[in-house]
Amino acid sequence: MDAGANSLSGKVETRVTKGVLDSKYLSKMYEFASPMPKTSFNLKAETLLKGDIADTKAEFNSNIADIDIKSAKFTLKDGSIKSDYKLSVPDLDTLFFVTKRHIRGSLVADGDISKAKDLDLTFNSNIAKGKVAAKLHNDELLADVSSVSANAVLHMFFYPEIADASLNAKIDYNLAQSRGSMKAQVADAVFVKNQTFDLIKQYTKVDMYREHFNGDVSAKIDKESVLASVDLRSKEASIKTAATKLNTKTNKIDTDITLRAKKNEISGRLVGDIDSPKIVIDLEKFMKSEAGKKVEEKVNKVIEKEINKLFKKLF
């Protein structure tokens, strides 16, 4: 190997077997939310030296993730690097120390990365029965989500699997500030069994489970606080929320919600734990609807029946 300042020529082969990363040091250096687990690895790399460029092909295999690189070109003159990559994570939950949340499933992604004055990275993956294509420029992340299954996403993040739908979304997020926004289009949404839909079916004869909803979901993200709105519509019904407050750290929700089934409108409030929020119905509005009047008729009949029983006992 010749090693002149700008006239490198040769080949370097690197082999590491049964290596162990210094998890304690890395956790402190990168200020991970929780300690990085013990990570063992094997590394095989081959670097071709030509001029002022070192071109590396590498395979990194560990108990957390595997990374394959076909060509990582490092330019000695300006310290820039340009590389492809393929990332495989068999268990996303092992990345809790980075993601700060539990996630089910696995991940395979590929893309390119370059670092000179700026950092640029592309990311492509099949996730939750759909596709995600993202671009990172320094701290700015832009992502396009295509045909992702809502039910699969809810399952991944340990949220209640209340509905399934096809989602398309655009995400704009600043990693340094932990702030951003999301705009999503929902198609063919269907809901699982719940008490609210059961009551609507009982008093309005509208089967909300047979309805297929389409519409929009938007959200503004500020660290763990999310401010969202939902507007879903079907042939016979609609579901709307505005200023929905979610906290991903405490797992809490606080929102007003309006459900309409034909001419019947039910307004209420969801508050508490996302997994099992309390539901408070606006009875005044509900009683003015056709369904409310039917409930009132049934209640009156029950009261009348009980009064008649009482009078029969008295006389």
Protein language model regions, located:
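Extended amphipathic alpha-helical repeats with heptad periodicity, i.e.
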Residues: M1-A3, F60
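Short, T/G/N/S-enriched strand-turn elements that build extracellular solenoid repeat scaffolds
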Residues: D2, K70-K73
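Short beta-strand/loop motifs in extracellular/secreted proteins, especially
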Residues: G10, G130, G180
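Membrane-embedded beta-strand positions of outer-membrane beta-barrel proteins
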Residues: V12-T14, Y85, F123, M182-A184, ...
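Beta-propeller and related beta-repeat scaffolds in trafficking/envelope systems
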Residues: E13-G51, A72-A116, V132-I162, Q185-V226, ...
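Outer-membrane beta-barrel pore domains and translocons
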Residues: R15, N61-N63, S88, N126-A128, ...
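Repeat-solenoid scaffold signature
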Residues: M156-N174
